Curated annotation (Swiss-Prot):
The gene is rplJ. Keywords: Ribonucleoprotein, Ribosomal protein, RNA-binding, rRNA-binding. HAMAP family: Ribosomal_uL10. GO terms for biological process: translation. This is Large ribosomal subunit protein uL10. Disulfide bonds: none annotated. SUPFAM superfamilies: Ribosomal protein L10-like. GO terms for cellular component: large ribosomal subunit. It comes from Bartonella tribocorum (strain CIP 105476 / IBS 506). Part of the ribosomal stalk of the 50S ribosomal subunit. The N-terminus interacts with L11 and the large rRNA to form the base of the stalk. The C-terminus forms an elongated spine to which L12 dimers bind in a sequential fashion forming a multimeric L10(L12)X complex. Forms part of the ribosomal stalk, playing a central role in the interaction of the ribosome with GTP-bound translation factors. The keyword rRNA-binding applies. The lineage of its organism: Bacteria, Pseudomonadati, Pseudomonadota, Alphaproteobacteria, Hyphomicrobiales. PANTHER family: 39S RIBOSOMAL PROTEIN L10, MITOCHONDRIAL. Belongs to the universal ribosomal protein uL10 family.
Length: 172
């Protein structure tokens, strides 16, 4: 990479840090190419991204962002997992770490809050924004459905009574 490419990459990475809801930093030493591709595809499907960057460039890109406090995590072979949804990157990273012992989560950030390894794991156990939205819609629509059933019930009962009288008249 020449200087211009490095500047462009740092600018791009800085924007990614600013736009992301959460960032997870992990060591990936010993992972095979297929394992890395698997991680990238899982993260991409979930709406996040994985990037391997030189530590020095990542530290420069962190300057001026809310995530600046995690600069100390960038030692050794590190990668960055990030997503706009604060839950996605931690969830995918923790799930991947469970099946790959060479993938070690170092920590991360959510906005201006630095996250320890345990905090990243706790964050991963929470439902995502889409799951929360679905639950909220379900909670809101359920009472409306029940009200509609209660309002329509008397009309249905009247119709059944009239139908029963009609049956009796035909039988007699």
């Amino acid at each position: 990479m020449n200087r211009a490419e490095k500047r462009e990459f740092v600018t791009w990475l800085n924007e990614a840090f600013q736009k992301s809801g959460s960032v997870v930093v992990a060591h990936y030493s010993g992972l095979t190419v297929s394992q890395m591709n698997d991680l990238r595809s899982k993260m991409g499907e979930a709406g996040g991204a994985v990037k391997v960057a030189k530590n020095r460039l990542a530290k420069i890109a962190l300057q001026g962002t809310e995530s600046e406090s995690i600069a100390g995590l960038f030692t050794g072979q590190t990668l960055i997992a990030y997503s706009e949804d604060p839950i996605t990157a931690p969830k995918v990273a923790v799930d991947f770490a469970k099946s790959n012992d060479k993938f070690v989560i170092l920590g991360g950030s959510m906005g201006a809050t630095s996250l320890t390894v345990d905090a990243v794991k706790s964050l991963a156990s929470l439902p995502s924004l889409n799951e929360l939205r679905a639950k909220l819609v379900g909670m809101i629509s359920t009472p409306a459905t029940r009200i509609a059933q209660v309002v329509n019930a008397p009309a249905g009962q009247v119709a059944r009574v009239i139908g029963a009288y009609a049956q009796e008249d035909k039988a007699a």
